[in-house]
Amino acid sequence: MTENIHKHRILILDFGSQYTQLVARRVRELGVYCELWAWDVTEAQIRDFNPSGIILSGGPESTTEENSPRAPQYVFEAGVPVFGVCYGMQTMAMQLGGHVEASNEREFGYAQVEVVNDSALVRGIEDALTADGKPLLDVWMSHGDKVTAIPSDFVTVASTESCPFAIMANEEKRFYGVQFHPEVTHTRQGMRMLERFVRDICQCEALWTPAKIIDDAVARIREQVGDDKVILGLSGGVDSSVTAMLLHRAIGKNLTCVFVDNGLLRLSEAEQVLDMFGDHFGLNIVHVPAEDRFLSALAGENDPEAKRKIIGRVFVEVFDEEALKLEDVKWLAQGTIYPDVIESAASATGKAHVIKSHHNVGGLPKEMKMGLVEPLKELFKDEVRKIGLELGLPYDMLYRHPFPGPGLGVRVLGEVKKEYCDLLRRADAIFIEELRKADLYDKVSQAFTVFLPVRSVGVMGDGRKYDWVVSLRAVETIDFMTAHWAHLPYDFLGRVSNRIINEVNGISRVVYDISGKPPATIEWE
């Protein structure tokens, strides 16, 4: 009997902040299970979830507007601790009898708050002290409105000159509100505050650990599929790889992995996938060489969106054909992760923040009535990686830079040809190899090479050549929503350029992309 790792759980109500998923990830990092729901849930749903505590997230709207989001009143009647963050604090204050109004001074960025009263939330936590010994906390503010009167049964815990109620608390009811973001790293003691709330005030045990998550997932897979056979599309990416390892641990040879080599992978990637999962880990893998099929389907197509659709359609066709060859397969496994599951459909009113959903459910043939197995659907990407390490997958593979689903199909600009893919693979491998050698790979968030369908004149020896151009791209980002181009050293870029031009026959010029996001996107297509 595996331990119930969902026994203690935190409910996070999403009011639309860009940081809400980060709040959930922080709670998980503390070893406690949590779920992220739209703010307009019902009392029955909250009762059914039975949380140990509730966090109200930040949000972009103003509580002073008539139809702005409100927490369900039951949140304050459930008898569990509640922690309001920014907008969450404001709606808590307003709903419990306080007052909120637009501030003359909008606070965005670093601030220092002074702790003026004792509270379980921040007791013993400080970044500095005032001259008279009061604790100071370095925090990250992001708000236009502010609480101007707290509910009558609350006390002021901390303040700034422009924000008189930076932290408020009702210790008896265990209600807390902060007018800053404890989940971001700029709030230096933010994790300690979240830990104080989740572990001490809500009294949640740290049951959510990689080893226990694996045990739980294996038990659930076995309970769901029994002795049935399962099929999985293995791409070599993080999600499908960890899904494969979990299923292999749970059901062994009853798992068949279909690896479709579409000709759009990185250099030697197909061989690496087959060697690792087939030879090293002993998984049952069906290898489908399908380069010609994909490239012929892409012939003549220049539009990026059309290319994506063609690659997706052909993959489904190839996967379906292989699935039909297998006998008695009852289940399809997928590497769906928690951010894929979070979507606006959870909102009954339609006012909750829309987080785009991209379920990766492939179109299976109608005659194949399969159940769906999604062992990662409760997990964030960082948790998937930690589980992968626990399962024995190599660090370099799990922490590789993101690679688009359509692969080189969207890194070859315009029409995709085998010649272009082969040149790009070799150029990109040199760039990545040099980044690793220079200890720069882990210092950038994503790096890759793009093939440009233009020829440029070059000089080789005494002759001139007229060959292709590639662009190097490297960015630094926290969330991939915005990104800065990486300021790689000039001598490093020169070394990469020289190697590519000298070693990859067919490329005469290398350029470096210095566009940020926005206005550019990270990928070129």
UniProtKB/Swiss-Prot annotation:
Active site: C86 (nucleophile), H181, E183
Gene3D superfamilies: 3.30.300.10, 3.40.50.880, HUPs
UniProt key word ATP-binding: yes
Single GO cellular component term: cytosol
Pathway where this protein functions: Purine metabolism; GMP biosynthesis; GMP from XMP (L-Gln route): step 1/1
Its EC number(s): 6.3.5.2
Pfam families given in the database record: GATase (PF00117), GMP_synt_C (PF00958), NAD_synthase (PF02540)
Segments traversing the membrane: none
Domain Glutamine amidotransferase type-1: 9-207
Subunit structure: Homodimer.
Protein name per Swiss-Prot or TrEMBL: GMP synthase [glutamine-hydrolyzing]
Organism: Escherichia coli O139:H28 (strain E24377A / ETEC)
